From Swiss-Prot:
Family from the record: Belongs to the V-ATPase E subunit family.
UniProt cross-references to InterPro entries, sorted A to Z: ATPase_E_C, ATPase_V1_Esu
Principal location class: membrane
Sorted UniProt keywords: ATP synthesis, Cell membrane, Hydrogen ion transport, Ion transport, Membrane, Transport
Protein species of origin: Aeropyrum pernix (strain ATCC 700893 / DSM 11879 / JCM 9820 / NBRC 100138 / K1)
Function: Component of the A-type ATP synthase that produces ATP from ADP in the presence of a proton gradient across the membrane.
Classification via Pfam families: vATP-synt_E (PF01991)
Protein name: A-type ATP synthase subunit E
Amino acid sequence: MAKVQGDPRRFADTVLEKPFKEALARVEEAREAGLKLVEEAYKSALSAARKRLESRVEEARERLQGLKSKADLEVRTEAERVKDELVSRLIEEALAEFRRRKAGMESYRQYLERVLGSAAGESGGSVAKVLCAPEDEEIVREVLGKLGLDGVSVEAVEGIYGGVVVELAEGARLDYTVNNIIAAEEPRLRRAVKRALFEA
């Protein structure tokens, strides 16, 4: 039988100590590797989450910008609609005021004399009928009498603001109405009124 010399505990500690330390070192390496993997996975997940969040923030920003642009367009469109409505009302009120005051305006009488005289002169006196606003019927008859055109038919037409339409014997019509002047000048008038009201 073999004889063991020395302290058996010390021998056991010495024999077991090396494998134990090696095992502990491997466990520590595995723990560090695991921590490193967890840390890398965390960083990767954090980076991916940050990218998703940034992407969603950018999408939200773009949507918000789109909504803002749409709202701006709607506001501008509505503002233009309101401006156009206001300008239309102002033009109508100005025409109504003109209709009320024109009978006493010497310049209006002169305008009628000039256009009726011109129409009679250009047509060689073949004026068949004159259409005018109801409130102008009397003044038109006076002007025609002054021009020696007493036999010309005069017809009052609702919707004429002022001026006259001259129908010639051969069927041609000469439109000297305020309506016609306004229609030709309306885009310019609208711009001028808008500028005066909204850009001053």
